[in-house]
């Protein structure tokens, strides 16, 4: 399947080696970025053999079967909806949407068009989660679960200095619960 990527940030840089590698089920056809990120995006295309770069989302959608959406959280719904309406399968970074109602709306749109819609949360496939699923039936009734997920953010010093990145801003579908809290409940 021909895959298009929307975004050129950290998560895209982490996944591109696998997505363009020999084990990938996809052919990465194009990468779409903002004008501001065009230079970095083109460098990623050159480094990983992605044949096309564009700053037009409509153009990206015209070239691919599947789109991987890796942009700030607040933009997930907008670009997911546009891809589904264009008849494209979607893999969208977490959170898919800032509310359950919006996520269900996207899921219904995908169902109505017989398209796949995936949220790119992978923790549930890790070995420690498999072990929990194996042991849980032996434990009996679970009455409480307490989880702690801690991760240093490269943006922490900016946060302390008063600069609030979208990943920390609840108004942008960010903040502890939307950005990292999903790992505790997945």
Q: For the regions a protein language model found, what residue spans apply to each?
A:
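N-terminal Rossmann-like dinucleotide-binding module
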Residues: 1-48
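Hydrophobic residues in well-ordered beta-strands that form the structural core
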Residues: 12, 69, 92-93, 117-119
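Core-facing hydrophobic residues within beta-strands of well-ordered domains
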Residues: 26-28, 64, 142
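Receiver (REC) domain switch-region micro-motif
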Residues: 31, 67, 145
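Beta-loop-alpha module in the N-terminal Rossmann-like domain of NAD(P)-dependent dehydrogenases
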Residues: 50-109
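Rossmann-fold dehydrogenase core element
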Residues: 105-122, 143-144
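Predominantly a Rossmann-like dinucleotide-binding segment in NAD(P)-dependent oxidoreductases
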Residues: 123-186
């Amino acid at each position: 399947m021909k895959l298009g990527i929307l975004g050129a940030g950290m998560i895209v840089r982490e996944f591109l080696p696998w997505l363009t590698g020999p084990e990938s089920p996809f052919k990465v056809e194009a990468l779409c970025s903002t004008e501001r990120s065009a230079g970095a995006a083109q460098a990623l295309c050159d480094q990983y053999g992605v044949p096309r770069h564009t700053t037009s989302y409509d153009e990206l959608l015209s070239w691919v079967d599947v789109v991987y959406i890796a942009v700030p959280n607040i933009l997930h719904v907008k670009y997911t909806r546009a891809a589904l309406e264009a008849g494209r399968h979607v893999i969208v970074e977490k959170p898919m949407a800032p509310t359950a109602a919006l996520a269900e709306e996207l899921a219904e749109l995908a169902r109505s068009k017989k398209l796949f819609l995936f949220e790119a949360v992978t923790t549930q496939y890790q070995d420690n989660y498999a072990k929990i699923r194996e042991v849980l039936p032996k434990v009996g009734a679970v009455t409480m679960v307490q989880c702690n997920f801690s991760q240093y953010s490269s943006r922490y010093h900016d946060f302390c200095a008063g600069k609030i990145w979208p990943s920390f801003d609840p108004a942008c579908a960010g903040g502890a619960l939307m950005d990292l809290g999903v790992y505790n409940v997945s």
